[in-house]
Design a protein with these regions (language model features):
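Solvent-exposed, non-transmembrane regions of membrane-associated and secreted proteins
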Residues: 1-235
């Protein structure tokens, strides 16, 4: 289950055992739905079998008109960038910095999420949105998709410590804010993403990404204690 304070994001987390990401087109009750459900790319066991269990992935549609599913992730992004209303042209909802999570504070960037047996708190350490010109392989890279795709020049390699460090560095560099958190290569990660707000065609590669690490309870699954270095976030 995912529930983010100050938003209407409050949904069960689903997983399609067929591996076909079927909850993109059906709701949590299995009924056909254009809004879909919140779902994992792979459950923990499957992700572990592919060697990508260190980065679990959660996604849902950006239901802009109804302002549901993961649309309000954009509100979190925008209010933390100093915006006062939703950037989507048909939303324009006023954004209250006193209600939406303040990612500069530990309380605001720490979210309670329970997925496939992991019931814990997760800390946001990077977030950013890419536009419709972004290479498609970014989605594969960010989510550690465990299969080659020659058409977009993506080659899957089972992550090792060097890859994880490179991946962390890439996400920190691209983050739209310095949140003052530097993850460890031994952390348990969670990548959450949804479609972009202003580049929203069916074939667009625009996405909004949030990168989190498990902090409570601290994960030791990948050799660490989930400790991280925190500095003062940039103003």
């Amino acid at each position: 289950w995912i529930k983010i304070q100050g938003t209407n994001i409050d949904y069960p987390i689903m997983y399609d055992a067929t591996g076909k990401l079927g909850y993109s087109g059906k709701d949590a009750d299995g009924k056909k739905s254009t809004s879909g459900a919140v779902y994992m790319h792979h459950n923990v066991a499957t992700a572990d079998s592919y060697g990508i269990g260190q980065n679990l992935v959660l996604t849902a549609h950006n239901s802009r008109v109804s302002k549901t599913m993961f649309h309000q992730l954009h509100h979190i992004q925008e209010v933390n960038l100093g915006k006062t209303e939703c950037a989507y042209r048909k939303c324009k909802e006023a954004l209250d910095p006193n209600t939406l999570p303040n990612l500069k504070t530990p309380e605001g960037r720490t979210w309670e999420i329970a997925l496939d047996g992991i019931d814990g708190k997760w800390e946001v350490w990077s977030f950013y949105e890419v536009n419709d010109k972004e290479p498609e392989k970014t989605l594969y890279y960010n989510t550690w998709w465990p299969a080659d795709n020659k058409s977009i020049k993506y080659t899957f390699k089972t992550p090792d410590a060097a890859f994880v460090q490179e991946w962390i560095d890439t996400q920190l560099k691209r983050s739209q804010m310095d949140l003052g958190v530097t993850p460890s290569t031994t952390d348990q990660f969670l990548t959450i993403y949804t479609c972009g707000d202003n580049h929203d065609s069916d074939t667009a590669t625009s996405r909004l990404y949030f990168f989190l690490r498990q902090v409570e309870p601290a994960s030791t699954k990948f050799g660490g204690t989930a400790a991280a270095t925190e500095t003062t976030p940039a103003a």
